[in-house]
């Protein structure tokens, strides 16, 4: 028996398809999302509707974004969901969530079992629309969730941690074993809730500067910031901000990265790389 076939659909490796089929896990996720009628609910990658059906049961209208044309067509003809669905058959990586929020007249509640092969770049795409998003609930590779929630001084802490926590309050919800999927992935999974900050705890003047600093620091994470960020900050400037130049990228807090970004935005012209 081909374990890549589920409900008559052959899971496509290039789309990173693993279909959720554990009812306890499904119920737990839907309970965490707690969808309500009248809310602008948006699902990324509905697949075979494991989450779409129980969420859709509670709603009058649901928007879904599905890249796989066969799955999009299948949803279109779904016996009870079909009439409730607005289906965008396209790549979520190119989707304009800001336009959709404007069209729906309220911030979006986004959820989904994200394809693990694009989960990190998709998170960065979504972060650029946090003004248009109320909250997000995602099934991700457990290692990615660990990175999202990690604090300084840990191996999991990296650029994704800093940028996610700059934009959102990040809350782990549930761990999910490979056996909850068909075909079972080779990794453990977890569900995470991301709630964009209503008021930024660490405002920055130019998020592009924060992005550049974190990229340069974590690309050379074993180096001290005296070396990895030496082209941007002198030892005197770092010391003046109360930041030890002998620290590595993983030792610096989100607040300190934001402090550095604001200094650079005020005192230097960001050179586009």
From Swiss-Prot:
Keyword annotations for this protein, in alphabetical order, are:
Cytoplasm, Methyltransferase, RNA-binding, rRNA processing, S-adenosyl-L-methionine, Transferase
SMART domains registered for this protein in UniProt: rADc
EC numbers, comma separated: 2.1.1.182
Which top-level enzyme class is recorded in the Swiss-Prot or TrEMBL entry?
transferase
Where the protein is mainly located, per its record? cytoplasm
Q: Which Gene Ontology CC terms are recorded?
A: cytosol
Family in the record: Belongs to the class I-like SAM-binding methyltransferase superfamily. rRNA adenine N(6)-methyltransferase family. RsmA subfamily.
Q: What is this protein called?
A: Ribosomal RNA small subunit methyltransferase A
Q: Which organism is it from?
A: Escherichia coli (strain SE11)
| Gene name as annotated | rsmA
């Amino acid at each position: 028996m081909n374990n890549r076939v589920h409900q008559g659909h052959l899971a496509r490796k290039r789309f990173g398809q693993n279909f959720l089929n554990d009812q306890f896990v499904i119920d737990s996720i839907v309970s965490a999302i707690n969808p309500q009628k009248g809310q602008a609910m948006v699902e990324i990658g509905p697949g075979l509707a494991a989450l779409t059906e129980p969420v859709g049961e509670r709603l009058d209208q649901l928007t879904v974004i599905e890249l796989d044309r066969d799955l999009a067509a299948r949803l279109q003809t779904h016996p009870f969901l079909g009439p409730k669905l607005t289906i965008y058959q396209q790549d979520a990586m190119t989707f304009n969530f800001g336009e959709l929020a404007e069209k729906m007249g309220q911030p979006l509640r986004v959820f989904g079992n994200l394809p693990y092969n694009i989960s990190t770049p998709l998170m960065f795409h979504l972060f650029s629309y946090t003004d248009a998003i109320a909250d997000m609930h995602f099934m991700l590779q457990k290692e990615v969730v660990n990175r999202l929630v990690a604090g300084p001084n840990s191996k999991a802490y990296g650029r994704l941690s800093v940028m996610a926590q700059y934009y959102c309050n990040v809350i782990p919800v549930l761990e999910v074993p490979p056996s909850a999927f068909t075909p079972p992935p080779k990794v453990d999974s977890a569900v995470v809730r991301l709630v964009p900050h209503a008021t930024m705890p660490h405002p920055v003047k130019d998020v592009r500067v924060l992005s550049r600093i974190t990229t340069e620091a974590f690309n050379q994470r074993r180096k001290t910031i005296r070396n990895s960020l030496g082209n941007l900050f002198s030892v005197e400037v770092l010391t003046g901000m109360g930041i030890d130049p002998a620290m590595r990228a993983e030792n610096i807090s989100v607040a300190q990265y934001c402090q550095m970004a604001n200094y650079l935005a005020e005192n230097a012209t960001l050179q586009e790389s």
